[in-house]
Amino acid sequence: MLERIKDSFTHSIQTKIDASEALPESIAKAAEMMVHCLLGGNKILACGNGGSAGDAQHFSAELLNRFEVERPPLPAIALTTDTSTITAIANDYSYDEIFSKQILALGQPGDILLAISTSGHSGNVIKAIEAALSRDMTIVALTGKDGGPMAGLLSINDVEIRVPSNSTARIQEVHLLAIHCLCDNIDRTLFPQDEQQ
């Protein structure tokens, strides 16, 4: 058991090392897009399932409240939190539409969708991307494995941050780090006077 726990740490560290080589450019581009979005008076919508829903809420909370520096709140909405809306859509239409219908109502041209799926195969996240694109939104996709069908929906205007791993747990761990990197870059670009070491 102890060896298995140590292996989990080792595998997590190695995945982060691999990601540190593969992901910085994508994360930097995504952060730049988010800064441009926010400066333009737009907002960021976020969605995912299970642990990825938690990540969507985590990202939204960091923007609405604060990350590591004091600053004004920034507009972000996690589409995973309104149980009345989610269950109404799932019951009346389908689970695949729980995010897309919200995006069609709330999304505006210039907004960004942060779409999170460890596999890239989540049907409702795929529908969310399609809805966002129909609203002239830009996509930042956090994925893993081979990117799945989500990767195929993205254009040169979008960004995929694909974790180089096939382990769902390891992908989720790097997704959280990527989210923290996005928040840090957003804060330090928008509020450089608040920079701390």
From Swiss-Prot:
**Similarity remark:** Belongs to the SIS family. GmhA subfamily.
Q: Which UniProt keywords apply?
A: Carbohydrate metabolism, Cytoplasm, Isomerase, Metal-binding, Zinc
Free-text cofactor note = Binds 1 zinc ion per subunit.
NCBIfam families registered for this protein in UniProt: PRK13936.1 (NF010546)
Provide the E.C. number(s) assigned to this enzyme.
Answer: 5.3.1.28
Function, as annotated, reads: Catalyzes the isomerization of sedoheptulose 7-phosphate in D-glycero-D-manno-heptose 7-phosphate.
Which species is the source of this protein? Shewanella sediminis (strain HAW-EB3)
Q: Which gene encodes it?
A: gmhA
List the record's Gene Ontology CC terms alphabetically: cytoplasm
Which one of the record's GO molecular function terms can you name? zinc ion binding
Which reactions are catalysed by this chain?
2 D-sedoheptulose 7-phosphate = D-glycero-alpha-D-manno-heptose 7-phosphate + D-glycero-beta-D-manno-heptose 7-phosphate
The protein here is known as Phosphoheptose isomerase
Positions of substrate binding: 49-51, 62, 91-92, 117-119, 122, 172
